[in-house]
């Protein structure tokens, strides 16, 4: 059972600005996650092992954030995977008629496998530390298929209390001096995402053209669609923080079960 949902960023300002709004938002997400009683996390990242034409599900029992240009060595995440839950996720995705593949690293025996994970998983899990199943979206699949994937992943949890985290940064073209240059579409995209979260209206994302996210240079749409499917109804949303301190937008939001 999904007991908690979150949109969490994966940008390094969360470490560089420990008193900033994003870091404070992440600490608040951690408090709410603890209060939810979630024993494990299913986390969707846009930067993991991306499979042509398929959703990806990490089956490994151990997770280790690989060295990367965004995260200092002292912040690299080490934690546990959730092989049993991963198998259930794959089973429900298959039965939903969705293309999905399981992944291990180094060995097919999940108990002996340590999967190198990306900053998109490692940064949120540093704050929201739980045994986790890492999943990756697939941009050639439709919005509706991403929602159905979220629904299938929720079914996989059974009666176990599990949280779903959409790791997402938004428009990456807020400044002219960023690595991707300026995009006039980044701010409107981010403004509309904030509005959707405030109104608890993730379902509206289903009608968004993915080209809009691409024009805004955002990596967030697909994970939020999966989150929408996983949550269904019966959750209240709260936007905890938003900022674009560099070239990309970062947002923290919680989705808690209604009493």
Residue ranges of model-derived segments:
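Short helix-terminating capping/connector loops at secondary-structure junctions
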Residues: 1, 159-160
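Flexible, D/E/H-enriched segments
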Residues: 1-39, 50-147, 178-259
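Beta-strand elements within well-structured catalytic alpha/beta cores of enzymes
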Residues: 39-45, 160-168
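Catalytic metal-binding/acid-base residues of hydrolase active sites
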Residues: 47-49, 170-171
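Non-transmembrane, aqueous-exposed alpha-helical and coiled segments at domain scale
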Residues: 51, 151-156, 162
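Short, catalytically relevant binding-site loops at active-site mouths
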Residues: 141-142, 170-173
């Amino acid at each position: 059972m999904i007991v908690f949902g979150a949109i969490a960023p994966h940008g390094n300002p969360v470490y560089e600005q420990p008193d900033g709004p994003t870091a404070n938002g992440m600490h608040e997400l951690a408090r709410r996650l603890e209060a939810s009683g979630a024993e494990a996390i299913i986390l969707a990242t846009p930067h993991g092992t991306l499979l042509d034409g398929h959703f990806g599900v990490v089956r490994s029992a151990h997770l280790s954030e690989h060295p990367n240009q965004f995260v200092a060595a002292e912040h690299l995440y080490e934690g546990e995977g959730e092989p049993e839950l991963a198998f259930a996720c794959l089973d429900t995705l298959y039965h939903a008629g969705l293309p999905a593949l399981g992944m291990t690293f180094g060995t097919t025996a999940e108990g002996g496998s340590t999967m190198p994970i990306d900053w998109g998983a490692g940064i949120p899990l540093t704050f929201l530390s739980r045994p986790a199943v890492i999943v990756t979206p697939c941009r050639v699949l439709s919005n509706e298929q991403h929602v159905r994937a979220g629904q299938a992943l929720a079914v996989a949890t059974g009666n176990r209390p599990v949280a779903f985290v959409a790791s997402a940064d938004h428009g990456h073209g807020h400044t002219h001096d960023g690595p991707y240059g300026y995009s006039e579409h980044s701010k409107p995209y981010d403004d509309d995402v904030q509005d959707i979260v405030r109104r608890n209206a993730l379902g509206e994302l289903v009608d968004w053209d993915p080209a809009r996210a691409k024009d805004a240079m955002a990596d967030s749409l697909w994970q939020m669609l999966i989150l929408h499917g996983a949550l269904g109804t019966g959750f209240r949303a709260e936007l905890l923080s938003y900022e674009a301190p560099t070239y990309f937008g970062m947002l923290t939001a919680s989705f808690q079960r209604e009493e």
